[in-house]
Amino acid sequence: MKKEKAVVVFSGGQDSTTCLFWAKKHFAEVEAVTFDYNQRHRLEIDVAASIAKELNVSHTVLDMSLLHQLAPNALTRSDIAIEQKEGQLPSTFVDGRNLLFLSFAAVLAKQKGARHLVTGVCETDFSGYPDCRDVFIKSLNVTLNLAMDYQFVIHTPLMWLNKAETWKLADELGALEFVRNKTLTCYNGIIADGCGECPACVLRKRGLDQYMNEKKGANVR
């Protein structure tokens, strides 16, 4: 893979930034694509652009505002509360988001001569999102190859990692402090450690605390 080119689906959050560092290690050339889908916090796009610039990665922003029209949800509408009722998907789930993002990323990748796609979806901490499952990614990979007559490979470095293990990977890539201080995961639009209260921040902090405690314990032995 080292001699090939990859396109990373990039939001500027913890997971996709970790994947960007992973891709830079594994591929000769890396580009990033961010989607503007009228997300609640436009800062996400600015953060993604800033990180890409700092890492010297070519960055494309694609307009996906139709998602806002088709699938109102808590990530695009400030009047919808961030919550998860028993037996239902979280209000932050956007129908078709990863399907569309990866499909458009594939079109872009083919135009740029890349066949590798990298995404930070994860089944371990996937919060019930059906489009973060490994079976979906494998199915979409086959579909994209058939639809475009092109041999794409979708990479999911975080698929079987929990949040603590994702922090560990960032650390192994020499990017832990970068990811901690410069990414935007918070649903309330606060960079770095975030608000500490929304589901994304709680998951992120729990994972970081677990990893740092494990690392500390390993160093004591």
From Swiss-Prot:
Cofactor: record remark: Binds 1 zinc ion per subunit.
Protein name: 7-cyano-7-deazaguanine synthase
Chain sites annotated for binding ATP: F10, S11, G12, G13, Q14, D15, S16, T17, T18, C19, L20
Reactions accelerated catalytically: 7-carboxy-7-deazaguanine + NH4(+) + ATP = 7-cyano-7-deazaguanine + ADP + phosphate + H2O + H(+)
Keyword annotations from UniProtKB, A to Z: ATP-binding, Ligase, Metal-binding, Nucleotide-binding, Queuosine biosynthesis, Zinc
Family: Belongs to the QueC family.
Gene that encodes the chain: queC
Main function: Catalyzes the ATP-dependent conversion of 7-carboxy-7-deazaguanine (CDG) to 7-cyano-7-deazaguanine (preQ(0)).
Pfam families named in the record: QueC
UniProt record, GO biological process: queuosine biosynthetic process
